[in-house]
Amino acid sequence: MAPPHVVDEQVRRRIVVEDEIKSKKQFERNYVPMDFTIKEIRDAIPAHLFIRDTTKSILHVVKDLVTIAIVFYCATFIETLPSLALRVPAWITYWIIQGTVMVGPWILAHECGHGAFSDSKTINTIFGWVLHSALLVPYQAWAMSHSKHHKGTGSMTKDVVFIPATRSYKGLPALEKPAVEEEVSEQEHHHHEESIFAETPIYTLGALLFVLTFGWPLYLIVNFSGHEAPHWVNHFQTVAPLYEPHQRKNIFYSNCGIVAMGSILTYLSMVFSPLTVFMYYGIPYLGVNAWIVCITYLQHTDPKVPHFRDNEWNFQRGAACTIDRSFGTIVNHLHHHIGDSHQCHHMFSQMPFYNAVEATKYLKAKLGKYYIFDDTPIAKALYRNWRECKFVEDEGDVVFYKH
């Protein structure tokens, strides 16, 4: 027989689980989709915030590149430190800082793909292609698939990434409705018990580490986390189902960028050594990938955010079901506020990134309860969402994540 304090803790946990389930079910049952039109939302934001300033955008690029150069220059002194005990933490510090700073140009290239960088399509293409190619991102190819994501955000059928799996896809038995709606069924409670007690923290952390490290390149190469397709999909095939025939030349251009950057890295490896290139560029590059996966996953995945089937979905409802989060003052600044103004970005992707924070104030006032901001610490949110956002039901026009 378990000691009394152990039994009490088990009872307390069961009560907490039941309360969480009831609260979540009540929120989902009472949820009413937003009825604002996109024009009503746009009219709530001052017109001057939509004006793009090419010079201002280029200055952001210069600032980011100068910052990267300064961090790189400081790292060149690491090997002069007298002991390994000093060099190891110095390298780790460099990798963390440089990986964080390099996200800035990644975001600016992403803005180019939306046409938010400049009124000039040529300027957008040049800056976007150079910046994304330097980070081994196929600029045109990803910009086109990302555009489809924006057009179908929140839709179970139209989105191309972060689409929830369904109960049947997971091979789970159909959920039996309880006799009394307010009660928690034994099946549902058991489902939550499994999530809490059977899925160990080490398993969750290991899965998160894998996705943060390899999720982005796997998405580009094999469409990992993307929409199901009849055959192998990637961002480098000119005949991939992600693209139309008239877009094939753009895939060729983006592939040229990857080949060019790969050639530069190969040349530098021959001149300085592969290890040197990996230390200065490779590990920060992995850091950039981890940031991108972390940011985008948390923007589109949360237990309280619905997804819609065709009868209830429209563009503005899907755009409103993205989540703003603060990553801290410094990181928000370095990442051009892509994390804490993302709902505004999804509503108006051609709005200049440097106006999105101010525009978010007006957006929040207009949307009211439909504006979503989550202040959960980032690491905790990652762990919670990975544990709790497993699937949605096969039925229903408005569905929420379950586990």
Swiss-Prot record:
A motif (Histidine box-1) lies at residues 110-114. It is a multi-pass membrane protein. The keyword Lipid biosynthesis applies. InterPro entries: FA_desaturase_dom, Fatty_acid_desaturase. It catalyses: a (9Z,12Z)-octadecadienoyl-containing glycerolipid + 2 Fe(II)-[cytochrome b5] + O2 + 2 H(+) = (9Z,12Z,15Z)-octadecatrienoyl-containing glycerolipid + 2 Fe(III)-[cytochrome b5] + 2 H2O. Its EC number is 1.14.19.25. Disulfide bonds: none annotated. Keywords: Fatty acid biosynthesis, Fatty acid metabolism, Lipid biosynthesis, Lipid metabolism, Membrane, Oxidoreductase, Transmembrane, Transmembrane helix. GO terms for molecular function: acyl-lipid omega-3 desaturase (cytochrome b5) activity; oxidoreductase activity, acting on paired donors, with oxidation of a pair of donors resulting in the reduction of molecular oxygen to two molecules of water. It holds the Pfam family FA_desaturase. It comes from the Eukaryota. It is found in: Membrane. Pathway: Lipid metabolism; polyunsaturated fatty acid biosynthesis. Its main location: membrane. One of its GO terms (biological process) is alpha-linolenic acid metabolic process. GO terms for cellular component: membrane. A motif (Histidine box-3) lies at residues 342-346. A motif (Histidine box-2) lies at residues 146-150. The chain crosses the membrane at residues 65-85, 88-108, 123-143, 202-222, 251-271, 275-295. The keyword Nucleus does not apply. The histidine box domains may contain the active site and/or be involved in metal ion binding. Belongs to the fatty acid desaturase type 1 family. omega(3) desaturase that uses both 18-carbon and 20-carbon n-6 polyunsaturated fatty acids as substrates. This is Acyl-lipid omega-3 desaturase (cytochrome b5), endoplasmic reticulum.
